[in-house]
Amino acid sequence: MNQELTNNPFNPLTPPKVFDEIKVSLASPERILSWSYGEIKKPETINYRTFKPERDGLFCARIFGPIKDYECLCGKYKRMKYRGVVCEKCGVEVTLQKVRRERMGHIELAAPVAHIWFLKSLPSRIGLMLDMTLRDLERILYFENYVVTEPGLTDLTYGQLMTEEEFMDAQDQYGMDAFTANIGAEAIREMLSQIDLEAEAEQLRADLAEATGELKPKKIIKRLKVVESFLESGNRPEWMVLTVIPVIPPELRPLVPLDGGRFATSDLNDLYRRVINRNNRLKRLIELRAPDIIVRNEKRMLQESVDALFDNGRRGRVITGANKRPLKSLSDMLKGKQGRFRQNLLGKRVDFSGRSVIVTGPELKLHQCGLPKKMALELFKPFIYSRLEAKGLSSTVKQAKKLVEKERPEVWDILDEVIREHPVLLNRAPTLHRLGIQAFEPILIEGKAIQLHPLVCSAFNADFDGDQMAVHVPLSLEAQLEARVLMMSTNNVLSPANGAPIIVPSQDMILGLYYLTLEREGMVGEGKIFGSIDEVQHALDAGEVHLHTKITARIAQIDDEGNEVLKRVETTPGRVRLGALLPMNNKAPFELVNRLLRKKEVQQVIDTVYRYCGQKESVIFCDQIMTMGFREAFKAGISFGKDDMVIPDDKWGIVDETRDQVKDFEQQYMDGLITQGEKYNKVVDAWSKCNDRVTEAMMSTISADKRDENGAVMEPNSVYMMAHSGARGSVTQMKQLGGMRGLMAKPNGDIIETPIISNFKEGLTVLEYFNSTHGARKGLSDTALKTANSGYLTRRLVDVAQDCIVREHDCGTDRGVTAEAAVNDGEVVASLAERVLGRVAADDILRPGTEEVLVAAGQLIDERMADAIHEAGVQTSRVRSPLTCESEEGVCAMCYGRDLARGTMVNQGEAVGIIAAQSIGEPGTQLTMRTFHIGGVAQGGQQSFQEANQDGTITFENPQLLLNASGESLVMGRNMKLLIKDAQGEERASFKLGYGSKLFVKDGAQIKRGDKLFEWDPYTLPIIAEKAGTAKYVDLVSGIAVRDETDEATGMTQKIVIDWRAAPKGSDLKPEIILVDSDGEPVRNDAGNPVHYPMSVDAILSIEDGQVIEAGDVIARIPREGAKTKDITGGLPRVAELFEARRPKDHAIIAEIDGYVRFGRDYKNKRRISIEPSNEAMEPVEYMVPKGKHIPVQEGDFVQKGDYIMDGNPAPHDILSILGVEALANYMVKEVQEVYRLQGVKINDKHIEVIVRQMLQKWEISDSGDTTLLKGEHVDKQEFDAANEKTIARGGRPASGEPILLGITKASLQTRSFISAASFQETTRVLTEASVQGKKDKLVGLKENVIVGRLIPAGTGGATQQMRHIATQRDNVVIAARREEAEAAAALAAPIMDADIVDDDFDTLVDTPESRD
């Protein structure tokens, strides 16, 4: 089943070593000696005159093997016949030179040395074993302090540190032999070897049972974990201190002579030389009985040199070479992008590949690419040689080579034969998703550029401005088969991210199809009637009708029974021509193209054709509409000049009007009616509205029908056609050319108040030009930075999801998630039908109000079912989801549902995790590259009211209203909702009403679309009086809690609450406003509590002390953040923040239980809020809220589990622990989708769910019960269940725990496979941990298998793996049967014969997993 590790050079027929898992553990000195072929005693490398390796040196041939194949060093024994002989003169074994890559040596150290990984890699393993701090350990190891290892009868303690003087004093005081204290690694080694692991573990468990407090149990648990891992893995603690150092084979640290007598060498040789030099010097000093201080210094230097060899720069100064460059240590060889893992094991270079510039190949078929002859000749050389020999045109390879070099005509004929039906792979970097590599059939072309089919450009994200692509040749038959069946461009019509076609015409083709399907009144031949498509074509050619004429034609259609019928349709000749290309199918009627086709519609047409007419038809159709699109665009001759950019006549009127408005605002500000911030917001708003109006005026001017002298409608404006069709450009760009450029943003995202009124046609003034440079430059720098960020996000996503593979058909779970339409701001952004499409139903989906089953449980919901669900008006339904899948490894096909790129149920072995990661990561890069297209134009404009988006009846949920003095109803509740219901009483839209909103409708009112429902102040959050009374300031001390701010510009004063905690006397103030009645008694609310309003920092007070107020008056206003520009800048980091599960800075506090709010006492800068549960049995829950933060709940309010006590973004961990997995998934999907939707990118929810599933793999143990699990430990769900099953079987108490959410980086580092984690990040830390625990890697994910050089267990690799598995099982059965037969026969033949011998004979016949134990 599995491939080799190394082959024996003498016996190539020995079976390769087969392995199922890889284990890493500490190497004992004995183990190191068993690997070694001899000790290296000298630091010499090679003799600079003879270039022969020095004996006993770092390249010694006696230890590591000969330098030339089958030849000893002195030349006495040469050639094969002596192989295996050891030469008596030079001591070299005669064998292959290759053994110099595998034989290791060793260095015997004169003094033990601590391994820096186990010392410095936090948490320090040696420190945990000895219960000492890292600083103390370093003092001992680097010879600063002594440590007591055996106190004897003195009053010293074990493990006590002493300085040299203290040590001397103690010796004088207690005598030399009364105690032992030691220094250096010897002391540490001695202490480690004295540890009895079992006793230590017992002791720690006992301590843990007694320990109280916060820190103590944590520390004990940490130590216990390390002790347990040593016990389980069979490692000994003293092996963390080395007495022998292994030396890696010389070929892996080569020394190469350069010309001019110099040598290039690997840094490792320098590091080893240092170690050997110091070690030899130390040996000599010990023999000479040198003074203690000298020996000690030498030992310290030895320790430092070994540290540098293992991990240079981890401790102390970096050891540098001759050129002041740090030397690359063993750790550096593994780490980072250039390290062994990422450079050589995960990223390999490929032979049989070439690259060249791409040009467009519009005459190619979709499955073809043009390959330059020169390139093909070079790439297919081996195939050509073999054909030449087979045909007898050459007898040797050399001859064939000559023929090919001369490029004889027969060579080209043979190349044609070879290439036919042999697909090649094309790849464009960066390969962001799997469509970045596709297979094509090569067509030989002249020239030197690769021709690419225009329709696949969007999949490769390629354009023809000098992009290059690489060509790879699949060599083996299997590779060719996979290229043809799985990777052919014709098999990749749909995008795996959202299931929409990705083979879609763009740019010119769209323009051509748009022009083709235009319809204009009054064109020549209007109203004519034609009998067939051919007649229409004839009339067109004769010039009797125009492409855009309105005509009637008879068109052949397929009806529902499948018969061909002729239908009369009103259409245009252009559309008739397009309709002629449609495949005949009743699901693809002529109506599909009988409309103006823009980009979206074209995509829809292709989608429909693909879904209902099959792949072959749709590929042919795509090719045909591509050709037609290009041809029509060329015939239409659309181009534009400067006069096509029309400046609307009323532009200046609108601008002047806005200028007056802005003057008004300035005046109001001067009079002190509004604050600086409000003025700014209003001005920005006014200008963005002005901008929109100018844009509308421009668009209506451009898109208006113009007629010529004959009354025929003229062709639309060219620029308008390009933007409207979706070919190129957008309204934003057009408005900058012909309207006004609009508001600009500063680099920090603030909007500049003065807009750019000119457009590019008029030209900008110098000041306007200067203002616009900010945004443009920011756009460019953003692009450069974000590409890297996006790539890193993709890498983390791939890493966390790489082992998520479809492993089985059905896991049999009955769980699922509830799907409903995605609503954003009262607008349905994704209907229920869209969201359940391609999922498996978890329960029967019924038609509302009846028992009719639309979809049975366990059925895959396809387009037809989804339409039925939509028409029936189903509101919610339960579907299976990868989140709730109960497969042991990976997910099951039923929970995943449809494979988006194929449109059918997902296959087993599909790597859905990687597809999810690519689907989420790929648009990240796309979006970041797109920020600067609008050139930093701000898209401001705050919405301050809500209009009804449909007719219906109003109902309120949780209403809390208050009528103010002028009779307006104000919303006083925090979680009030307004619903619009249709005639059937089904909810059609819902809006959250913010506190302080003004309502314009009554409960139960009938409304029309476009009615104003409610409005709010977008810039400030009001605090509203709920009762009438006299306002009284409490603790609002001027200068400490309130500052009178006088505006220079207006001379008006207003009171603003400032941070009172900063003031010396302010820490115990509680600034608030209370209401008193005429007697001075506090006014009480309905619950009987006094009415008081705590003030938060930056609030603006709207009333004076002692002012009489009515219910509904505004007491204070809290400013909201101003309008920042939104682009994906907010987006990418937001996505990363969500997937990393970071806690947002000011995160919301979520109520954990239902209950009543009580305010506790205040502290210096926090206030305590507790929730008294409505259920008496539960404990109250307390929260600390920073003072000065706005708290939306009042004393005595009833809150439900999941309500916010403090505003902000919720932390995903809280959602998980309080509301559960499904709520978390909904939150993540909603938030991630929001970011992508803003950019118009569609991603299927499934992908996000797969990633969230990977983030939820671990459980945190909250109570260990009688299991071996420790409290606070993070374990996999499977481990958790297994441990509990074991304990329950023994009759013990099971452990309890809850799922925890890990960010993607953490989750990748905590995967069960240490190989995969090590190749991701923090390589040394991962490997240190793995080796202490003696971890086994079962090689289940993709990454581990790539690293050990196997086929991945997904796709075809997974299938072959299963076949091999089944085969070995069958073999085992047969072998067992044979063994029994043989034993029976032997027992009959010779009853005295020992059974063991028979066993052994049979073991060697077949190598099976069983016989490998």
Swiss-Prot record:
Its cofactor is Mg(2+); Zn(2+). It catalyses: RNA(n) + a ribonucleoside 5'-triphosphate = RNA(n+1) + diphosphate. Binds 1 Mg(2+) ion per subunit. Binds 2 Zn(2+) ions per subunit. Zn(2+) 2 binds at C811, C885, C892, C895. Mg(2+) binds at D463, D465, D467. InterPro entries: DNA-dir_RpoC_beta_prime (IPR045867), DNA-dir_RpoC_beta_prime_bact (IPR012754), RNA_pol_asu (IPR000722), RNA_pol_N (IPR006592), RNA_pol_Rpb1_1 (IPR007080), RNA_pol_Rpb1_3 (IPR007066), RNA_pol_Rpb1_3_sf (IPR042102), RNA_pol_Rpb1_4 (IPR007083). Keywords: DNA-directed RNA polymerase, Magnesium, Metal-binding, Nucleotidyltransferase, Transcription, Transferase, Zinc. Zn(2+) 1 binds at C72, C74, C87, C90. One of its GO terms (molecular function) is zinc ion binding. One of its GO terms (cellular component) is DNA-directed RNA polymerase complex. It comes from the Bacteria. The RNAP catalytic core consists of 2 alpha, 1 beta, 1 beta' and 1 omega subunit. When a sigma factor is associated with the core the holoenzyme is formed, which can initiate transcription. Belongs to the RNA polymerase beta' chain family. DNA-dependent RNA polymerase catalyzes the transcription of DNA into RNA using the four ribonucleoside triphosphates as substrates. This is DNA-directed RNA polymerase subunit beta'. It comes from Ruegeria pomeroyi (strain ATCC 700808 / DSM 15171 / DSS-3).
